[in-house]
Every structure is written in C-alpha cells, then in structure tokens.
C-alpha cells in the first residue's frame, strides 16, 4: 500500500529529519540524485538525452538543479530556466554552470523563441517551481510559462 503525505506532514518529516542530523542540503542532494537516476533509467534511450528544468526560488528548484547536475554527470545535456530565483550568488546555479549546463532567465535572456525551441527539443521536463509551498493563484509569469 502506498502512503502519501500531506504538505503539513511532509514539512514535519523534513523538520524532524533535520533536527536529527539529516540536513536540508543533504535531503536536497538525495532528492535530486534519486530523481536523476530515475530519469536516466526511464528515459536513457531518448534521443537526444536532454533535460530542461523550470527552476523556482524554493527547495523544489534546488532539487531540480541537483538533478540536472547529476544528469550532466550521466552524459545528458541539461538546461535550466530560472523563474523568480536570484542566481548570481547561488551555489547550485554556479555548480550547474561549471558542469556545462545552459542557463536561461525567464525575466532576462529567455525569449519566447528560445523557450519554444527548448520545449520542442528536450526529452524530459522537470518541474522545479511548484513544490509544497506553492499557492494558488499563480503569479502571471508562472502561469504563462506553464502554458507552454
């Protein structure tokens, strides 16, 4: 039998894990790594082996960035489109860029044509914007990118 957690239960589990020595950073590495391994196992035969993550400002965005880094290590091409994330001093973004990932800023260089091309030529799309902290009504930019 599968067990699903509510948002409140998930936050409680994470808080308790952190209090018992499993840091939020380690949880993020674990989540991103396991997502990448699953993607690689399920979609390894895709041609091209490319992944695009929509990366928001929360922990879900961090999970997505870790997954992209792991996919690069596994031979994938990876792109990230950041949405409402301050990335200039973000260590996960810097790691992703050092590994050869392509970064697009929804509010900067990610034109409609670039995004359309990315969406059409990527094998896997990772949602790194809507996590447990997501609230309805979505910000106009977020709703627009999800329309793709």
Regions inferred by a protein language model and the residue ranges of each:
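Glycine-rich phosphate/dinucleotide-binding loop and adjoining beta-alpha-beta core of small-molecule
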Residues: 1-5, 44-148
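Positively charged, low-complexity intrinsically disordered leader regions
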Residues: 1-49
């Amino acid at each position: 039998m599968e067990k699903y957690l509510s948002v409140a239960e998930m936050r409680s589990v994470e808080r308790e894990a952190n209090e018992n020595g499993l840091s939020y950073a380690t949880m993020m590495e674990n989540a991103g790594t396991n997502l990448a391994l699953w993607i690689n196992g399920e979609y390894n035969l895709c041609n091209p082996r490319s992944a695009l993550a929509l990366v928001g400002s929360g922990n879900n965005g961090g999970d997505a960035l870790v997954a992209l880094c792991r996919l690069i290590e596994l031979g994938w091409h990876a792109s990230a489109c950041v949405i409402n994330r301050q990335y200039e001093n973000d260590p996960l973004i810097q790691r992703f860029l050092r590994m050869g990932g392509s970064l697009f800023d929804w509010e900067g260089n990610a034109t409609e044509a670039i995004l359309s091309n990315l969406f059409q030529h990527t094998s896997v799309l990772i949602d790194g914007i809507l996590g447990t902290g997501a609230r309805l009504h979505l910000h106009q930019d977020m709703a627009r990118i999800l329309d793709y």
